Each structure stands twice: as C-alpha cells, then as structure tokens.
Amino acid sequence: MSLDLQYISQDPQHLPERPASTEGFFLENHGESIFGTVLIPGGAAVDVYPGIVLLHGFPGYTSTFDLAQNLRRAGLVVVSPYYRGCWGSGGRYTFSGAIDDAVRTASWMHEESTAKTYHVDRDKLFFIGHSMGGFISVNATRRLSWIKGTAVMSPYDLAGRAEAGDAALDQLIRESVPVMNVESAEALAADAKMCEKKVGPFRTPLKT
C-alpha cells in the first residue's frame, strides 16, 4: 500500500470491509510486561502497510498518540510501546532498558505472526522517536539490521550531554522520577553515565 499524505490531518473514507482500529498489546521482556497500542489503517482484508515503532520521550508527561493517529491516517501501522517502569508497564525504568524494550517491540513486530495479525509489511519497518525516544530509536536501530530507516524529532543526546555537564540531566531525572517506577534518581543517573560510555553520541555514524 502507498502512503496518502492528504489524510494526515483528516480521516479517510470509512472502509466497512476492515475499518481502522486501535488495539492494546503486551509483551514480556526480562520477566516484565510492556504495554502499548497498535493503530491499524482501514482497508481490504489482504492489505498490508509499512510499520512504525513510535517511541515517546522521557516518561511521565507527554504522549505521541496524536502523531500515531496522523501516521495511521496516512497508511501506516503504528506500534507505540511504553517502556518498562512507566505508563503501566512492569519493572523499573532505565535508559538502557528502554533501548532494549524498543528492540524487543520491533522484533515482535517483525515476527510473521504479528505482521499477519496487524497487517504489517515485514520488509518495511521503521523507528520514529521524539526527544529521549529519538536517542532510543537511534541506538535500537544500531542493533537491528533489517530496520529500513529511522526518523527523530528534537532528539535528546543522552550520550553527548556530558559536554554540557550533569545539571540538566539531573534536573530532568528528578522532575520525572515521581511518576515512574525507578530504583532511585541516583541509580537512573548512573545508568545514564553507563549509556554515555556504551552507545556513544549522535555524531557517531549508525553504520560504518
């Protein structure tokens, strides 16, 4: 199926054979449940669409559901996972864990049974990430050779932020900790420093 950008800001014609739908999903990752939504365009029973793993920013205050709806209108299947430790998913939130959750979600989307259920073209899978979700998207892409592309919006460069000092990240963590399940603000800051060393800043090429 081709994209139809005229429908980004308006609903397409109702298709009674298979109307557009929104479904919940959950996955197991390291013994904890990841929850999220799948938005599926309406169409014929045999239609398949490119798939998007849409990754939200640092948990607690913002959602990308409006963007997911616009992408679905244009003809994309949009999977939006909620990382462990936030928005109802089990476990504790860490930056490294969020990358792992993104990889787990994309791998699930790439499975034949999932693609069949949600009308996904397995050969056309992409990441889109906003803010911290951009950082997560880039680093999840590095681990999955079959991802076709990645788009980021206002990405937060967690690995490169050391050049600006720790104050901004410390403030970000302490503002968000009350609405997440974390071990502690200090543990999350330590995980961020581990990510700095392990994944590298955005200026590092995705592929060499």
Please name every model-derived segment.
Residues S2-D47:
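N-terminal cap/lid segment of alpha/beta-hydrolase-fold proteins
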Residues Q13, G24, W146-T208:
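The alpha/beta-hydrolase serine catalytic core
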Residues L54-G57, S80:
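Structural cue for short, hydrophobic secondary-structure segments
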Residues G134-L144:
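Short glycine-enriched nucleophile-adjacent loop
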Residues Y49, H56-G60:
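Active-site glycine-rich loops that stabilize anionic/oxyanionic intermediates
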Residues Y93-Y118:
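Alpha/beta-hydrolase active-site loop
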Residues A68, R72-G88:
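Conserved alpha/beta-hydrolase
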Residues T117-S131:
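Alpha/beta-hydrolase fold nucleophile elbow
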